[in-house]
């Protein structure tokens, strides 16, 4: 059943044009939502903001996480050496940072870069919080080429040191093929902010052409790096 009312809406000047692209992570009994707060004063006026909840309906706002033009953020669901790990996107690459308190972030570093002359040459960004597997962390991400086509890729990051990419698949796992993925508000886009594993099956929920929501899936044991 679809709730007729939104669970979260924009407040204040920084969210005047919307709250977008939420990515959820659960640490202990708390859900943390990292989202894009779009102020609309320019096309670069987007900031990473955070809210938390125990029931996914009542949210506590924690404000701006990084006061810079940034987006595509999520928390790893496991602390690394006692610290929270944040994934984010300073154009055009995927970055990470660490924190003791979810407020001050340090040790910013690039995890994964774009690759010239191909489907991920323009920019890349996290598609949802990395998922723990027996191989390491499965990280899905979106990639944009010079024609502004959005596809999804997959990479394996080290289970002990998640700043290290073990391998990334050379070809996209999903791209715009269907009519509603090719034509819409923004054409030629598949864009995911979250995935679910149920009964060893990975469900990837994604936006098609910035207009509709779709889902694709694969058995976990078929994902081989």
Question: PLM features: residue spans?
Answer:
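Beta-rich carbohydrate-recognition and catalytic domains
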Residues: 1-17, 25-122, 131-188, 199-202, ...
């Amino acid at each position: 059943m679809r709730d007729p009312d939104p669970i979260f809406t924009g407040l204040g000047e920084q969210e005047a044009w919307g709250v977008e692209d939420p990515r959820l992570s659960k640490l202990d009994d708390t859900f943390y939502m990292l989202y894009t707060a779009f102020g609309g004063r320019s096309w670069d006026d987007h900031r990473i903001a955070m809210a938390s909840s125990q029931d996914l309906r009542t949210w506590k706002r924690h404000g701006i996480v990084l006061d810079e033009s940034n987006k595509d953020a999520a928390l790893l669901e496991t602390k690394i050496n006692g610290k929270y790990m944040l994934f984010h996107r300073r154009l055009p690459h995927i970055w990470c940072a660490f924190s003791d308190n979810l407020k001050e972030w340090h040790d910013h570093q690039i995890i994964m870069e774009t690759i010239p002359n191909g489907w991920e040459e323009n920019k890349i960004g996290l598609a949802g919080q990395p998922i723990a597997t027996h191989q390491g962390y499965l990280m899905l991400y979106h990639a944009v080429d010079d024609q502004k086509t959005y596809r999804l890729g997959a990479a394996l990051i080290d289970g002990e040191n998640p700043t290290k990419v073990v391998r990334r698949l050379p070809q996209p796992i999903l791209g715009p093929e269907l009519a509603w993925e090719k034509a819409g508000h923004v054409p030629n886009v598949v864009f995911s902010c979250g995935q679910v594993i149920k009964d060893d099956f990975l469900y990837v929920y994604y936006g098609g052409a910035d207009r509709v929501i779709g889902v694709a899936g694969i058995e976990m044991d078929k994902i081989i790096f």
